Curated annotation (Swiss-Prot):
It comes from the Eukaryota. This is Selenide, water dikinase 2. The record marks K27 as: Important for catalytic activity. The active site is at U24. The gene is Sps2. The keyword Transmembrane helix does not apply.
Length: 370
C-alpha cells in the first residue's frame, strides 16, 4: 500500500481526492457521443482514406506518401482511481497500449505520456506524484519488452484534476493489422480479463475512508475480502494485452475491441455495428473479479454488472475467434501468462438482420481469482 509520508507527503494524502471521477468513468455515455457526431463527417466510421475512423479503439490511416504503410494511433487518458501514483502509471500504460493491441499490433514507434498536474497540488505533492506516475509508466513500458521504444513527454499542463494517459503510435504494414470488421456467424467470443476492476478499486477507497458504503460491505464481507479483491484487480489492470494480441494472429482472429468506459455490452455493440456482415453477438457468461458482484449488490450498484454495462478501466480484449480455435487460444493464453491471467469463452456470433450485441437471459456469472 502507498505510504505518502515515506515520500514527504502528509499521512492523509490521497491522490483520488483530486478528482470527482475515477478511471474510465470519465467518459460520457456512448449514445451521447453518437448524438454529437450525428450528421457530421466525423460520424462516418469508414471515411475515405481511412480503414478505421470514428467509433473504434484506434485510428488506422493509410499513408498516402508511403504506400504499403499505415499509421496506427490512439490517444487515451483518465483520472486517478488509486492513491499510489506509481501503480497509476502502470495502469495508465496498459490502458493506452490496449487500443492498439485491439487491432493486433504489438510494436510501437513512439509512446507519448499525457500528464496534467492538479491546480490543488502543493509544489511538493506535484513533485512526488508526477515523478512517481512517470516512473510507473516508464518502468512498465521497459518491463514488457519495449526498452527501445521511445517514450516522449512533451509538456506538463495544469488542470483542476490530475490526468494521466498517453498517445501510442505505430507505423506498420497491412499484414500486421487485424481489422475489426470480419466477424463470422459461428465465431466464439473470448474475453481476456475479468470484469469489475473499477468496483474493486472503489471498494478499496471506501475501506480507506471508512465510508457508509464500506460499512455496508462489512455486513457480509471482511477487510481481507476487500483487500483480496483489490489485489486481483491490480494484477489484472496492470497486465498488458500484448499476449492476447499476439495470439490473435496465431489463431486468425476475425476482430477485437478492448473493454473500458462503455462496459462490455457497450463495446460489444460498437464492435458488432462495425462488421461487414450483419451479426448478433450473444453473450452468455460474465466473468467477474471475486467478491465484486457481492460488493455491488450490497451498495445497490449491481444492475450495471448484471446487465454487462459496468465501467471498466484497462480491461481485456473481446475477440471473435473461429470456433475451432477458441479452446486452443485460451490454453495458449494461460500458458503465455504463466497461469497468472485467464481468458474466458463468453458467447458466440450468429447471423442477424441487424447488427447488435445482447446479454442472454440465462447469463452465467463466473467468479474469478488470479
Amino acid at each position: 500500500m502507498f505510504q505518502p509520508e515515506k515520500h514527504g507527503l502528509e499521512p492523509d494524502f490521497q491522490l483520488t481526492k483530486f478528482t470527482t471521477h475515477t478511471g474510465u468513468s470519465c467518459k460520457i455515455p456512448q449514445k451521447v457521443l453518437e448524438k454529437y457526431l450525428r450528421g457530421t463527417e466525423i460520424e462516418n466510421k469508414n471515411n475515405d482514406g481511412y480503414l478505421i475512423g470514428s467509433g473504434m479503439d484506434c485510428a488506422v490511416i493509410p499513408l498516402k506518401r508511403h504506400k504499403d504503410y499505415l499509421l496506427i494511433q490512439t490517444v487515451d487518458f483518465f483520472y486517478p482511481m488509486v492513491n499510489d501514483p506509481e501503480l497509476l502509471g502502470r495502469i495508465a500504460l496498459a490502458n493506452v497500449l490496449s487500443d492498439v493491441y485491439a487491432v493486433g499490433v504489438t510494436q510501437f514507434d513512439t509512446v507519448e505520456m499525457i500528464v496534467s498536474t492538479s491546480t490543488s497540488f502543493s509544489e511538493k505533492e506535484r513533485d512526488v506524484v508526477i515523478g512517481l506516475v512517470m516512473k510507473g509508466f516508464q518502468n512498465s513500458l521497459k518491463a514488457n519488452g519495449y526498452r527501445n521504444t521511445p517514450l516522449i513527454i512533451r509538456q506538463l499542463k495544469i488542470n483542476p484534476w490530475c490526468i494521466i494517459g498517453g498517445i501510442a503510435t505505430s507505423v506498420c504494414r497491412s499484414e500486421e493489422i487485424i481489422l475489426p470488421s470480419n466477424a463470422q456467424p459461428g465465431d466464439v467470443l473470448v474475453l481476456t480479463k475479468p470484469l469489475g476492476g473499477q468496483m474493486a478499486m472503489d471498494a478499496h477507497l471506501w475501506q480507506l475512508n471508512q465510508t457508509e458504503k464500506y460499512k455496508k460491505l462489512l455486513s457480509e464481507c471482511s477487510d481481507a475480502d476487500i483487500k483480496e479483491t483489490f489485489e486481483i484487480a491490480v494484477k489484472s489492470m496492470t497486465y498488458l494485452n500484448k499476449n492476447a494480441a499476439l495470439l490473435m494472429h496465431k489463431y486468425q482472429a476475425h476482430c477485437a475491441t478492448d473493454i473500458t468506459g462503455f462496459g462490455l455490452l457497450g463495446h460489444a455493440n460498437n464492435l458488432a455495428q462495425f462488421q461487414k456482415e450483419k451479426v448478433l453477438f450473444q453473450i452468455n457468461k460474465l466473468p467477474i473479479i471475486k467478491n465484486v458482484l457481492k460488493f455491488s449488490t450490497l451498495v445497490g450498484q449491481s444492475t450495471k454488472f448484471r446487465s454487462g454495462r459496468s465501467v471498466e478501466t484497462s480491461g481485456g480484449l473481446l475477440i471473435c475467434l473461429p470456433a475451432d480455435a477458441a479452446d486452443k487460444f485460451c490454453r495458449d493464453f494461460e500458458e503465455a501468462t504463466n497461469g497468472e491471467q485467464k481468458s474466458f469463452q463468453i458467447g458466440h456470433v450468429t447471423a442477424a438482420n441487424e447488427s447488435d450485441a445482447v446479454l442472454c437471459e440465462d447469463v452465467e456469472f463466473i467468479e474469478v481469482s488470479l
